[in-house]
Design a protein with these regions (language model features):
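Interdomain helical connector at the RecA1-RecA2 junction of SF1/SF2 helicase-like NTPases
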Residues: 134-187
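Short glycine-/polar-rich loops that comprise or flank the Walker A/P-loop
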Residues: 22-23, 49, 93-94, 117-120, ...
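Substrate-gripping "pore-loop 1 plus following alpha2 helix"
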Residues: 78-95, 104-106, 134-151
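Inter-Walker segment of RecA-like/P-loop motor cores
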Residues: 43-84
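Hydrophobic residues on the short alpha-helix immediately C-terminal to a glycine-rich phosphate/catalytic loop
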Residues: 12-20, 38, 113
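Walker A/P-loop
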Residues: 1-16
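SF2 helicase catalytic motif II
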Residues: 70-71, 84-123, 127-128
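Conserved helix-turn-beta segment of the N-terminal RecA-like "Helicase ATP-binding" lobe
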Residues: 21-25, 32-57
């Protein structure tokens, strides 16, 4: 799903949980800061879903789990390497995997996460890639350049999720005073 930043990723998960389309959701992000941001949003908007931050917590009783790709790979691999092979999450543990910022760093290295879990896969991005070695569309089995759905800026503004953009003029020093060669550093 192509959607602008701030257009309601938390709301999407909320709707799917309320509609009983899924019981347990794995929300993946590529940075710890995004994991923390998502956990805070889920706690604020979905407190009954008992969001679990898999980067810092070991709980397994939530409905929404949030993790980075490396943390989830570690959880999958650690279980496979453990004595007895008991994994923390079985292949059917999650009904839905939501991939935040799906255009970044998920192509070859972390594709094993999607192969391991038997779950529906939803990718969220504002800027899908359509390159030979990094194609967001092919990762989700889509025709290049054709997302499943797109939620544009105008739609998000009309629904009240986003404020309309506002241009602000910010005069910079070099625009006011110009640039003189002798003032430039060697770098």
């Amino acid at each position: 799903i192509v959607g602008k930043t701030g257009a309601g990723k938390t709301a999407l998960v909320d709707l799917l949980l309320r509609a009983h389309w899924c019981k347990r959701v794995l929300f993946l992000a590529d940075r710890v800061a995004l994991v923390n941001q998502a956990v805070n949003a889920f706690k604020a908007h979905l407190p009954d879903a008992a969001p679990v931050n898999l980067v810092t917590e070991k709980a397994t009783d939530g409905r929404v789990y949030v993790s980075t790709y490396p943390s989830m790979m570690g959880l999958i691999n650690d279980g496979a390497n453990a004595e007895g092979g008991a994994r923390r999450f079985g292949i059917g543990h999650f009904d839905l995997i939501v991939v935040d910022e799906a255009h970044r760093s998920i192509y070859q290295k972390y594709r094993a996460i999607f192969s391991y879990f038997d779950a529906l896969l939803v990718g969220l991005t504002a800027t899908p890639k359509d390159e030979i070695d990094r194609n967001t569309y092919s990762l989700f089995g889509l025709e290049s350049g054709v997302p499943t759905d797109a939620y544009g800026l105008d739609d998000a503004i009309a629904a009240g999720y986003l404020a309309p953009p506002r241009a602000v003029s910010v005069p910079l020093k070099f625009q006011r005073e110009g640039i003189r060669y002798q003032d430039l550093s060697d770098d």
